A protein has these predicted regions:
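Residue-level signal for inorganic ion chemistry
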Residues: 25, 611, 743
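Short coil/turn segments at secondary-structure boundaries
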Residues: 53-58, 99-106, 189-190, 405, ...
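Short amphipathic alpha-helix with an adjacent loop that forms part of the alpha/beta core around
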Residues: 38-47, 699-702
Length: 781
C-alpha cells in the first residue's frame, strides 16, 4: 500500500475497520483555510463542542522513506473558541511548504489509562518484534514527546498473546495491531494508541515504520530468526535444571551480577572480546579465587554463558560461590534458595546483589541483618552456623599476620617483570599468545580477583561504620578521597604534558596501553589515537583534585575495636583500616598491570592478522581458542581463520538483532519481557545542571563543564577525567565499579548503571540535572 497523510491514513483505517476506534476527525488543506479562516473555524466549533487537539498532516509526514516525526507542531487541549483555534492552527501550519498540507482536528481524549506507541518491528534492525513504549500517567503525548520516563514491552511476533504482560490490555492491543497490519498490508508500522479507563482502545496514528538498517545488513529471514529463538529457548531450558554440586532448584541469568560482563565487554560483545573475558576470568579463575578465600568450590561450573552472543552470569552458580565452604548442606541450600527468590522478586537489584541480597563477610552490622533477614527461614542454630562461617572467612581475609590479599599483591607485582622476560624468548605467535594468557591468569586476573574481593569486603565494613554512626557520610567520602590510586595520576600527567613538563613519549610509555574497552581489539589504545583522547592544544587542563587528608580518630578506632571484639573478629581497627586502604589501591593497581598485558595480547593478534591479510575487524569474530590453534602452514591457518570469521560474522548478525532482558528468570523471557527499571547508583551528594555529551561525540566535542554519557565503566575511559567534566552517566556499572570510585574521589556527581532504556533517553537529551543527594536525574530539555 502507498501511505498517505496522517489524516488520510486514519480515514482509510476508520472506513476499513469498524471495530477499531478512531476518534472523529476533521481535516482540511492549510492553504484553503487561509482563504476563509472564519468558515473553517465555525465548522470546527459546530463539529466539536469540547477541547480539541490540532495536529499536523503534512505532505512529507508519515512516508515510507522518512516519517519527519516531530518536525511539525501539535497543539493539545485547545478550547473550541475562534481565538484559540486560530492561534493553534497558525502554530501547526506555519512551517508548511506544500499546498496540500493538511490540518487535522480531533477531540481530546480524556480519562486515559495508558498511552503509547507500538512498533511492529524493531526500528533499528527490522527484527520481528512488537516493541511497545507506553506510559500510565494519563497523558496522550508522554511517549511521543519524551517528556517523562515511560515503560517498554518487547514481544516476539511468534509470542502467544497469553504470554504477554498484565501491565495493560496487551492482548487487545496486539489483536488490533495485527488487524491494522492486514488492512495496510504491512508488518512494519508505527502505531500510536491509548486506552481509556474502561480499557477501550483508540488509535491515534498509523504510519510506515522507517527502519534504520534492516537486520543490520544481514539477510536473516523471519523464519530463520524464529528458529534461532526456539533453539535459544531450548538451550536456556536445558541449562536451567538442577546441577550436580550446586544448590538451587533453577538458574537465573544476569548481565550485571558480580563480574558484570555487560559493563566490562558490553551486552553484545564481539566473539574475541567474549572469549578473552571467559579465558581470563569467568571459565575458571573466579572459582579458584573464591575457593582460596574460603567460599564454596563450584568448579567445574562456568560462570558465564553466551546466549546468542550476549553474555550472562549464571546467578545460581555465582551465588553458590559466595556460600562459605564450611556450611552444612541444609543451611547452604536454604540460604541459596532464599537468595534466588530475592532476586526473582527484585530483578532490578541484579547489579547490586553483593550489597543488597548476599552476605559474604561478617561486618559490624552483619549479625543483626542476618538475624532479621532469615528469622522465618532458618533456625537459630542455622543462623549461628552461617554467621560463624562468615566470621571465619573475614578473619582469614584480614588476618593480623599475612592477610590473604597480600599474597595476591605479591603475585601481581611479578607480572610485569615476568612478561618482559617472556617477550625476550623466541617462539611462534600462537605459543606467545598462549603463554601470555597463562601469565595473565596466574599473576594478573587471579590475584586481581582476590584483591577485588577484599576491597568489596572493605566497602561493606565502611558501610557498617556509617550505619553504626562511627563515621559520618562526609568522613566516609573524605576517607575514600584520601586514597591515591593509579588512575588519579593520569590527570597529573596530562597537566605536566600540557605544561611541557612531560614528553608525549614518556606519557604514552606509562598510559599508552589503555583502551576504553579493554577486551575489544577494535578499541584503539591511547598510543594509537592520542589526539582523539588528549588534545594538547586545548586550553582546558584537568584540575587534579587534592587528596583529602582523613584518618580515623582514636575514639573512632576504639569504637571499632570494641565492635570487632563483640563480633568475634581477631584483628584490630587500625589493621582493618590499613587493609581497606591497601586493597582499594591495589585493586586499581592490579587492574592497570594486567590490562597492560591484555592490551599487548590484542596488539599481537592485530599484528598477526595483518600478516595474514586479515583485518582486525574480521579477527574480532574469531575466538581466542581458535586464534591459538596451530597449523603446519600459514595458508592452512589463514583458510581456517577465514572460515571462522565467516561463521562468526553470521552468528553476530543474530547477536545484533536479538532483544533480550538484562535478567532472565525463565527461558520464556526471550519471547516476551518488560524492560526492567534499573536502580541507578548516585555518587556524591552534589547537584548540577549541564549539557549532555554522548559517548560517540566525546572526541570532537569540548566536554568541559558538561555531563558525559558512556555505556561502560572501564578503566580505559579514564581520559574523560582530563576534560574537566561536570558529571557522568553510565548505562552499566555498580556501586563499587571503577567509575563510581573515580567520581567519588573527584567529587564529580555521577549516575552509574541507569540501564538501557533510561540511558538512551538521557544521552539524547540536551540538558540534564543530576541531584545526587536526592537520587534524581532529570531531563530539562
Amino acid at each position: 500500500m502507498i501511505f498517505n497523510s496522517k489524516a488520510q491514513n486514519l480515514i482509510f483505517l476508520k472506513n476499513k475497520a469498524k471495530s477499531i476506534n478512531v476518534l472523529p476527525l476533521l481535516c482540511f488543506a492549510f492553504s484553503e483555510y487561509k482563504k476563509n479562516k472564519a468558515a473553517f473555524i465555525n465548522r470546527i466549533i459546530n463539529t466539536f463542542q469540547s477541547e480539541v487537539i490540532v495536529r499536523s498532516s503534512a505532505h512529507n509526514e508519515d512516508q515510507t522513506a522518512q516519517s519527519n516525526a516531530g518536525v511539525y507542531n501539535s497543539v493539545l487541549n485547545v478550547k473550541p473558541t475562534p481565538r484559540s483555534l486560530a492561534k493553534a492552527i497558525k502554530a501547526v501550519g506555519k512551517d508548511y511548504k506544500h499546498a496540500d498540507d493538511e490540518i487535522l482536528i480531533q477531540p481530546m481524549l480524556k480519562d486515559i489509562r495508558v498511552s503509547g506507541v507500538i512498533f511492529t518491528r524493531d526500528h533499528s534492525t527490522g527484527a520481528p518484534y512488537y516493541v511497545i513504549n507506553y506510559a500510565t500517567d494519563g497523558k496522550t503525548d508522554t511517549i511521543t514527546s519524551g517528556s517523562a520516563q515511560g515503560k517498554k514491552l518487547i514481544i516476539s511476533r511468534t509470542c502467544k498473546l497469553n504470554e504477554a504482560t498484565e501491565e495493560f490490555p496487551a492482548e487487545r492491543l496486539l489483536r488490533a495491531t495485527k488487524s491494522i497490519e492486514r488492512i495496510f498490508d504491512s508488518d512494519a508500522l508505527d502505531i500510536e494508541f491509548a486506552f481509556d479507563s474502561q480499557k477501550k482502545l483508540y488509535i491515534f496514528q498509523v504510519r510506515p515504520l522507517v527502519i534504520q538498517s534492516a537486520n543490520s545488513g544481514a539477510k536473516i529471514s523471519d523464519a530463520q530468526f524464529f528458529a534461532h529463538l526456539d533453539a535459544l529457548y531450548k538451550e536456556i531450558s536445558e541449562n536451567a535444571g538442577k546441577k550436580t554440586g550446586l544448590y538451587g532448584k533453577r538458574s537465573i541469568y544476569s548481565m550485571m551480577t558480580d563480574w558484570n560482563p555487560a559493563e566490562m565487554i558490553g551486552s553484545r560483545p564481539n566473539l574475541l572480546a567474549l572469549s578473552l573475558y571467559k579465558n581470563l576470568i569467568t571459565d575458571n579463575i573466579w572459582a579458584v579465587q573464591r575457593k582460596y578465600y574460603g567460599y564454596k568450590n563450584v568448579a567445574p561450573h562456568p560462570l558465564l554463558y553466551a546466549f546468542s552472543g550476549c553474555p550472562y552470569i549464571d546467578v545460581r552458580t555465582d551465588f553458590n560461590s559466595f556460600l562459605p565452604a564450611g556450611l552444612s548442606p541444609k543451611t547452604a541450600s536454604d540460604i541459596l534458595q532464599c537468595y534466588l527468590d530475592d532476586l526473582e522478586r527484585q530483578p532490578e537489584l541484579h547489579d547490586k546483589a553483593e550489597f543488597r541480597i548476599l552476605f559474604t563477610c561478617a561486618a559490624l552490622t552483619t549479625r543483626e541483618t542476618v538475624q532479621k533477614r532469615f528469622a522465618h527461614i532458618l533456625s537459630q542454630e542455622q543462623i549461628d552456623e552461617f554467621i560463624g562461617c562468615l566470621r571465619t572467612i573475614t578473619n582469614n581475609v584480614f588476618a593480623p599476620v599475612l592477610p590473604l590479599y597480600q599474597k595476591d599483591i605479591a603475585a601481581v607485582k611479578k607480572l610485569e617483570a615476568l612478561s618482559k622476560n617472556f617477550f625476550a624468548k623466541e617462539m611462534c605467535f600462537e605459543e606467545k599468545i598462549r603463554g601470555l594468557l597463562d601469565l595473565c591468569r596466574e599473576y594478573g586476573t587471579l590475584p586481581f580477583a582476590g584483591i577485588a574481593r577484599t576491597a568489596f569486603i572493605g566497602r561493606q565494613f565502611l558501610d557498617s561504620f556509617s550505619e553504626k554512626k562511627i563515621i559520618s557520610k562526609k568522613n566516609y567520602r573524605d576517607f575514600v578521597r584520601s586514597i591515591v590510586i593509579p588512575s588519579q595520576k593520569i590527570q597529573s600527567d596530562i597537566v605536566k604534558l600540557k605544561d611541557g613538563k612531560m614528553t608525549r613519549k614518556r606519557f604514552l610509555n606509562k598510559w599508552g596501553h589503555l583502551r576504553p574497552n579493554s577486551y575489544d581489539i577494535l578499541s584503539l589504545r591511547y598510543d594509537e589515537d592520542f589526539e582523539a583522547y588528549f588534545d594538547e592544544k586545548s586550553p582546558y587542563k584537568p584540575v587534579p583534585k587534592k587528596a583529602e587528608k582523613y584518618s580515623f580518630g582514636k575514639k573512632q578506632l576504639r569504637q571499632i575495636d570494641e565492635l570487632l571484639a563483640q563480633e568475634g573478629l581477631c584483628f584490630s581497627a587500625k589493621h582493618l583500616v590499613k587493609c581497606i586502604k591497601e586493597s582499594i589501591v591495589w585493586r586499581e593497581e592490579s587492574k592497570f598491570i594486567f590490562t597492560k598485558i591484555l592490551s599487548r595480547i590484542l596488539s599481537l593478534i592485530k599484528e598477526y592478522a595483518h600478516t595474514l591479510g586479515v583485518s582486525e575487524k574480521e579477527m574480532a569474530h574469531v575466538s581466542i581458542d581458535d586464534i591459538m590453534k596451530q597449523f603446519k602452514t600459514t595458508k592452512a591457518k589463514k583458510n581456517f581463520l577465514i572460515a571462522k570469521i565467516q561463521k562468526g560474522q553470521a552468528d553476530y548478525a543474530y547477536t545484533k538483532c536479538i532483544k533480550l532482558p538484562e535478567v532472565l528468570t525463565s527461558a520464556a523471557d526471550i519471547y516476551c519481557f518488560a524492560q526492567n527499571e534499573s536502580v541507578p547508583n548516585f555518587v556524591t551528594q552534589r547537584k548540577i545542571k549541564a549539557n549532555i555529551v554522548a559517548e560517540d561525540k566525546i572526541h570532537n566535542t569540548n566536554c568541559c563543564n558538561k555531563v558525559v554519557c558512556i555505556r561502560a565503566a572501564d578503566p580505559g575511559y579514564d581520559f574523560i577525567f582530563t576534560k574537566n567534566i561536570s558529571g557522568l552517566i553510565t548505562q552499566f556499572g555498580g556501586a563499587n565499579s571503577h567509575m563510581a570510585i573515580r567520581c567519588l574521589e573527584q567529587n564529580i556527581p555521577a549516575v552509574i548503571g541507569v540501564g538501557e532504556k533510561r540511558f538512551n533517553e538521557l544521552r539524547q537529551a540536551e540538558l540534564v540535572e543530576i541531584d545526587a543527594l536526592n537520587k534524581q536525574v532529570r531531563i530539562i530539555r
